[in-house]
Amino acid sequence: MAENAGNAAIFCDLAGTLVRMDETRQLPLDARGNVIVELLPGVAEKLSPLRDHLIFVITNQAGIKRGRLTRKSVEAAIAELDRKLGDILSGWEICPHDDADQCACRKPKGGMIAELAQTFGVDLTSSLMVGDQEVDEQAARAAGVGRFVYAKDFFGWK
């Protein structure tokens, strides 16, 4: 693992942190089944000035396993998010599994964070995770991320 490689990073959850979720806490879809990417308030304003940092998206998407989404549609949504943010993302990890799979990548486990840290030489103890749920905080802790901040506090939501 690359905990001491020297590069701090910002890890962000996707739905409910960077983009809007639907009423079932899933990524919203249009009539053709494409993910609707609607930035949440303050996201672009807060993240765009941080473009000199490594910024990653990590997301649980059990809808892939269940057939509601495809990996390609989630990747397209993250690419659209990146365009809306001004091409600031360094990378992303998607967990397509559900809880029954007991995989190492699904939050609250830290596998997605650890994978990105190893690939990009991230110093996890100097890094930050932003998320909207307790599983995000647990994943940050499991991976050894130095600081966790809830999205409402990071982006200044009421």
List PLM regions with ranges:
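Acidic beta-strand-to-loop metal/phosphate-binding motif
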Residues: 57-60, 128-130
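Beta-strand-loop-alpha "switch" segments that mediate conformational coupling across diverse proteins
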Residues: 95
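Active-site neighborhood of HAD-like aspartate-dependent phosphohydrolases
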Residues: 1-56
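Hydrophobic alpha-helical segments that mediate membrane insertion or helix-helix packing
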Residues: 16, 59, 139-140
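A short acidic, helix-capping loop that chelates divalent metal ions and anchors anionic groups
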Residues: 27-30, 64-68, 98-103
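Conserved protein kinase catalytic core
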Residues: 19-21, 66, 138
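A short secondary-structure junction motif
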Residues: 60-74
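Asp-based, Mg2+/Mn2+-dependent phosphohydrolase catalytic module
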Residues: 2-10, 49-51, 72-75, 79-91, ...
